[in-house]
Amino acid sequence: MGLTTHSLLSPEHLKVPYDRERLEDVGFMTCMTLVLLGNYAQTGHFGGPLAYTPYNVAAHLVGPELGGLRYDYRRPKHPYSDKFMLAGGHNAPTSYALWMIMGQALERQYKATGDPRYFVDPKVAILPIDALGFRRGAGALKNLLQNLSLDNHPLFAQAKARGIKALAGHIESTDVTNDVNGGPSGIGIATAAGKAAFWDFMGAPSSPKVIALEGEFALAEGHAQELKTQALAMQVGKRLRILLSDNNAGIDDVLIGGVIAAKYTAYRLVDQWTSYGWNVFTLDNGNDYDQIVSTLKAMEDWDPRDRRPMIAIGKTTKGYWPRAVEGKIPGYGPQLVSYPSHPYALKMNSDYFVALARTFEEHYGVEFSGIRQGPVADPRERLIQFKTNLDVVMSLLDRNGLGDWLADRLVALGDTVKDEVPLRFDVKIDPFLDGRLRVANLPVEPQKVTVANRLSGAEKQVAITLFRKPGEMAGTRRAVSEIIKWMNYVTDNRFITLAADLSESINVEHGSLWGHYDPEANPLGTRFKAAIQEAGNVSTAIGLVSQSASVDPNQFAGVWALSGTYGAFTPLMYTPARVWSQQNQDSRFRMGVLHILAGHSGPETAADGRTHFGIFATQVWKLFPRGQTIHLNFWDYNDVAPGYFAAAEIAARDPKVGIISLEVARPDFPVADRAQFADTDLKAAAKGLYVIRDFAAGQPRHGYVLAQGSSSTVNLVKQLPRLEAAGINVKVVSAISEELFDRQPEAYRQAVLPPEARYDLMVVSTGTRRVWPIRDVGPLTDAYSLTSDWDNQWLTSGLEADVIAEAHLDPESIFAGIQRFAQDHRQRLARQRDMLAALELPIYD
């Protein structure tokens, strides 16, 4: 299909009827509720949530036939619901407020009729009582009412069902329909392309779709900018629809006329998105329901053969108020708008708040309690006034059939979500639990397997080599494509890779059994083409793994994904991954596993220059709660498969493990002869730490040497005969993964590296002295270890051998370092004993 450069701008006037008055009422209630949240909590955001409200209300209530969301408030995390992303996370009050109103409407109708269609589990819903939890922690809320003698007060009876929910200052994916942790600006929206691509990959019909809300300042952020390329590269088409709130206002400045001087008239959002190939719609007034609904309808009716992603850019007012007239609040004066309205900075029951409330009172003939008597100092009385006035807003549900309409609307929308959707994969099975992926079942010999493309009917043979013979020249990176191939062979093409234009270089290119993904021409391809966009690539990977097509929340039916680049550049991926880890920790349903490949890591990346060294950079992958990620650092080809599949075996069964990071170096080395090791197990890496050389019996012991990294370990192994000849009796332990080691039986851990060994330990590593391979090393470990930052300086660059020597990780430096460590054995232990003895001496003032 031929596509024009420019798309439809400013959709035609809506000719299809919709319940505009109902939307406006719910919208005004939402605005008033979110202002009450800020007034009584005295924190939060103000102008942005108000600006988003018409978008939010329309998307949730007009229905899928008009381009709104298909979802079930009673089952908001149903996999086949459309995905709503409040990516501008600080605008959370608009969603909290709307969900409270919806939850109240359903609870009201259920109590009135007893009809189970209206029942929503209080643990799922957000209810008016949860307003008290706005920007509060769960611990503080547990006894809040009891501490103020309000636990039996009728105003707060709703809390008896399940307490008060904590509503975070920035929205999270656990919240009702929201499917993004909208924290750092631009980070959340960047995952939208991956979420949309997931449903294309799974072969879903036009729904589920993704509707994401964001603002112009956040879309200037780097991750969000990379989304432009990501979404077009994956050809997600109308499945992705962004609603942009363009009010030219940030936190403390305007964009045009502030950050960008007004004279640069060519800086136009519409042109920016159009130039990236997107299908762009514009709204003169993004706070007008007619224009919003007409745009949603135009998006819905668009030709699905057009694979351009969609964005609607609507001019909005930050600080929008439904009853404002020409920039003024009737009876008060100038409306608080633009960036000064960003935070909720109004004093409790301030004149401006009262003016807003008055317009609501006059419009609906209601009256708020106590707001004209100034701030409420007493905490108990504040909560009473807060809940009383919230109930004033909710009382509108009892008027003019509004509550009945809203409850019926939510039930009707919910009933459009079905438990069966035709998909390309069997969603009753989690392929990552297949026994062939267990370490014990990995084939040791090279495999030649026949794979069939069930869409095209094509067949071919694929060679997979998870293990190699001793002496073969193959570095750890060479094994990466093999583990991915085995994954895709076993899981029927459910392991996706996205690399920053480095797919071949970091050895993920050939992991795809059927080549490059294309939603139409090659939907079973698992290699997603990607630009040099580390942030965007990992965000897309997160979008992919954050979805599941299983109706059973405890059963996973989705994909795993890997994003990779040079180890030195992987910190660009950290913030999205951190936010993902938080989302995964609290998810109510099983999700996939994000993989980070730190390729070309360590000082071995010498020829490219020190800008490309992954020495300090890769250590960010340890900056997660313990047990929620597994980091793997490989030195030998035959460590990769057992180490990785041990991690995969855990992650597939432990929902807390949401990230596996792999660190490999560039050079090829001879595959190690494990017959010469103390631990001859070919799959020893699965245990995290394993013994290369044990203490020689009957001789004085000189300590433990922990080895990590490629050149460091290879060069250390080369020196073992020389060390033995010199009478140096050390135990050499390979450190692949502390996280895997932590999961081994106590007896194994004691045998390999008992706790006391940490006080008699040195490290030989291509990493740094800032982050050790294991925790709790002894006080003298740093003084004797060999690391790439031994002199606290950045290394220079040059040939690989030059830089390894500069890092003091060449064979001679390693021998000398271990020799010194061994010779000082008695002295080292004596110094530590003296330190402990000093603590036992009497201390006098």
PLM segments and residue spans:
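Cofactor-binding active-site loop characterized by glycine-rich and histidine/acidic residues
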Residues: 16, 23, 31-35, 50-234, ...
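Active-site nucleophile and cofactor-binding loops and adjacent substrate-binding regions
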Residues: 41-53, 84-90, 133-136, 147, ...
